């Protein structure tokens, strides 16, 4: 069993790039398709605390429920926002990666490199052609 977990959306390029960087470090993570299997309330609260971000910082803003629910207004408590995220998992920004070195919202995807226990094992180029590591696994940016 892997000691790395990714909350993943396979339709998201950032999430796909993050997953491939984890694999490029020689690790096969536990993949949680969070739209199908959202975290529990307690899991989501822990993820937010472990990332050291606000609840609002985890909210996706460019999705339908954000507008429909009026979430741009600052009138909702953290607990209410968490409830909306659990009811509409598409509101949870992604990918979230948990490793022994920390928990991060990996936007941009190369943020994952800061918390991987093993280095990249070779060159990595994102889907859009941006080079992230060279042939020796050294970070380029």
UniProtKB/Swiss-Prot annotation:
Catalytic activity: [glutaredoxin]-dithiol + arsenate + glutathione + H(+) = glutathionyl-S-S-[glutaredoxin] + arsenite + H2O
Protein name, as recorded: Arsenate reductase
InterPro entries per record: Arsenate_reductase (IPR006659), Arsenate_reductase-like (IPR006660), Thioredoxin-like_sf (IPR036249)
Lineage of the species this protein comes from: Bacteria, Pseudomonadati, Pseudomonadota, Gammaproteobacteria, Enterobacterales
Keyword Oxidoreductase: yes
Keywords: Arsenical resistance, Oxidoreductase, Plasmid, Transposable element
Short name of any one Pfam family annotated for the protein: ArsC
Organism: Yersinia enterocolitica
PANTHER family: ARSENATE REDUCTASE, ARSENATE REDUCTASE-RELATED
Feature: compositional bias, Basic and acidic residues: 125-141
Its job: Involved in resistance to arsenate. Catalyzes the reduction of arsenate [As(V)] to arsenite [As(III)].
GO terms, molecular function: arsenate reductase (glutaredoxin) activity
Top enzyme class: oxidoreductase
Gene Ontology annotations of biological process type: response to arsenic-containing substance
Record: active site: 12 (nucleophile)
């Amino acid at each position: 069993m892997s000691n790395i977990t990714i909350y993943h959306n396979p339709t998201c390029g950032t999430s796909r790039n993050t997953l491939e960087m984890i694999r490029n470090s020689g690790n096969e993570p536990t993949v949680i398709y969070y739209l199908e299997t959202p975290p529990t309330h307690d899991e989501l609260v822990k993820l937010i605390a472990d990332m050291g971000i606000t609840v609002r910082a985890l909210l996706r803003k460019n999705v339908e429920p954000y507008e429909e629910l009026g979430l741009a207004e600052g009138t909702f408590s953290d607990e209410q926002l968490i409830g909306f995220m659990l009811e509409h998992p598409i509101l949870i920004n992604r990918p979230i990666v948990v490793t022994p070195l920390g928990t991060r919202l990996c936007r941009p995807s190369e943020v994952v490199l800061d918390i991987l226990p093993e280095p990249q094992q070779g060159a990595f180029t994102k889907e859009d052609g941006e080079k992230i590591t060279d042939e020796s696994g050294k970070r380029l940016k």
